């Protein structure tokens, strides 16, 4: 399949030891003769330059245009039939001006990143750090619940007369069933702990299955006659408002949502990746201007027992070098945003800061934006919450419903949206870092929630928020087979930013 001029430009520059700004690549690719334009830009580059800027390229192109204009007004010294023409054989089937599709809309794009905590980690592991993060979590989520119930602090409930109507906003400290089949839930606020009893024959008991430790909820009900326990009538989650109206783009533009590439694994689906990258160069994908990657760019090392036997590339830096080469197959004029995952070379505890400078430099050729896990990226006015998704393991394991499974990861994602937190339980399967503030709380409702990690495709809608778990690019490993994981390989959900419709493309 013929390569897009922007990709040929990037490869030509890389072969000569140069990087270039995205805008510079676009200018070079849009030249009448991209190959000759690269020659002139490299020849004019400063001796110590490693990256060509848009100013460098524009100066070269402007100078050439002025020179060509002068030659056109002078008598021709070379007969037309003797003029030298540079032709790239790979471009013979490329429609005229096809590369101008994305380049022509580059100025219309907008990318904003919120919640990036890279370089802002304050946790030291001291006791006060844990106090700070849980107090911040309580304050953030309680603020979303206080307008829905007439709550009282735990200290005030203890002094209220028995039989009174009451409500409390608290963090779930404990959940256990009684010998009679009822549920006893302990809620904690900044003043103390108060017990709640959920009777098994009440409708509200159906919500107990959705509860997770350390999430913040509100409960309304009636105090027992002795005032020592609250009988629950209703349970409230921070939730997404039912009337939530998501934002959309004001032009026809799309984003590809992928995750779990796992370069370095023997099971990396290299052929499928090439098919995906080739498709991005076709007219059918011309509207796909953004690529959002939700973690696990590489397979990593030492992630699980016996992983070394399943590695094709054993050095972690070599894995990222190879991933960067595969990323170059993607059109050079696409905007790329990525977050790390649990296989990437960052700390395991969440939130995960983005890659260090050494890894960033490896992936610099495509000028990808790299942010922390989780982060919210707003593209063309549409906010997308990117979270790798390790906590989905815990939600799926703890929830008794047959609807919350690995085969339907969007249902577990829906529960996280209800709780307005991407990883509520502390001390379980998901490692959480104590920080001065809770970076895992969902303060602002996103228009789209994109996760990965479980290697399964899932698409859904919750209160008008689109949910996408994007599958993976790794065939089943021996480890996955041992834990009965059958991955959805080479899937790329394509999000229409102007309608929020989602179309899944398969490249295996």
Curated annotation (Swiss-Prot):
Described function: Possesses two activities: a DNA synthesis (polymerase) and an exonucleolytic activity that degrades single-stranded DNA in the 3' to 5' direction. Has a template-primer preference which is characteristic of a replicative DNA polymerase.
Family matches, as Gene3D superfamilies: 3.60.21.50
Family: Belongs to the DNA polymerase delta/II small subunit family.
Keywords: DNA replication, DNA-binding, DNA-directed DNA polymerase, Exonuclease, Hydrolase, Multifunctional enzyme, Nuclease, Nucleotidyltransferase, Transferase
Known catalytic reactions: DNA(n) + a 2'-deoxyribonucleoside 5'-triphosphate = DNA(n+1) + diphosphate; Exonucleolytic cleavage in the 3'- to 5'-direction to yield nucleoside 5'-phosphates
Biased composition (Polar residues): 86-95
Gene: polB
Subunit-level organization: Heterodimer of a large subunit and a small subunit.
GO function terms (MF aspect): DNA binding; DNA-directed DNA polymerase activity; single-stranded DNA 3'-5' DNA exonuclease activity
Protein name, entry field: DNA polymerase II small subunit
Organism this protein belongs to: Halobacterium salinarum (strain ATCC 700922 / JCM 11081 / NRC-1) (Halobacterium halobium)
GO biological process entries: DNA catabolic process; DNA strand elongation involved in DNA replication
Pfam families in UniProt: DNA_pol_E_B (PF04042)
HAMAP family, alphabetized: DNApol_II_A_arch
Listed Low complexity bias regions: 66-80
Gene Ontology CC, one term: DNA polymerase complex
EC numbers, comma separated: 2.7.7.7, 3.1.11.1
NCBIfam families: PRK04036.1-1, PRK04036.1-3
Region Disordered: start-end pairs: 66-122
